[in-house]
Amino acid sequence: LEWKRDGWLAGVTWFRNDYRNKIEAGYAPIGQTSTSKVTTDIYQWENVPKAVVEGLEGSLNVPVSDTINWTNNITYMLQSKNKETGDRLSIIPEYTLNSTLSWQVHQDVSLQSTFTWYGKQQPKKYNYKGQPVTGSEKDEVSPYSILGLSATWDVTKNVSLTGGVDNVFDKRQWRAGNAQTTGNTSTGAYMYGAGAYTYNEPGRTWYMSVNTRF
């Protein structure tokens, strides 16, 4: 669905993808490899008989004035799962909102602010052995947001300079390890699972670029 009028735009889209034989890490070991002290199970990628990814996408563009424009889009996940086990297919935000405010200050100067808001992120329900996750393997990433600012100057009709800062408030997200616990029961050496904390969110970053057009 979409509506347009006098520079305004609003829309919403429903999407659904039903999969057969989607590739996913298998749960059943197909063999083992051993050293003098360690025995490790071997797993392989397998086909998921049925899986589904479903959600909503929305957009809203607002012409605040002749020189200011506000654009927004959001994705909300309704489901993303293995239909055989009910487990999540991957670690993705419940929703992602992107908002951009652009101001054409002068014919050759523009300013822009960007805002991204990520929803809750949940890990898989089952580990690589097909058992329910426990302890730190169940850790979720809480919602958080990132703000960016930039300015562009058109030096000539062919050359422009852009400078700005990403992650203005220096929001940090640290990777704590692999999603699930691995280790050896005989030696007691374990690397405990990190749940959804499997990626880094870089801190504040300053940048500058030169762009050319022909």
Where are these regions (language model features)?
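C-terminal beta-signal and adjacent terminal beta-strands/loops
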Residues: 117-129, 152-214
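Residues that define the transmembrane beta-barrel architecture of outer-membrane proteins
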Residues: 4-6, 52-54, 91-97, 143-147, ...
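Residues on the lipid-exposed face of transmembrane beta-strands in outer-membrane beta-barrel proteins
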Residues: 1-3, 58-62, 99-103, 113, ...
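Extracellular loop and loop/strand-boundary signature of outer-membrane beta-barrel proteins
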Residues: 41-46, 82-88, 133-138, 148, ...
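Gram-negative outer-membrane beta-barrel transporters
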Residues: 11-19, 27-30, 35-126, 213
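Surface-exposed loop/turn segments flanking beta-strands in extracellular/periplasmic regions
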Residues: 24-44, 133, 181-193
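Short coil turns and loop connectors of transmembrane beta-barrels in diderm outer membranes
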Residues: 6-7, 20, 66, 107, ...
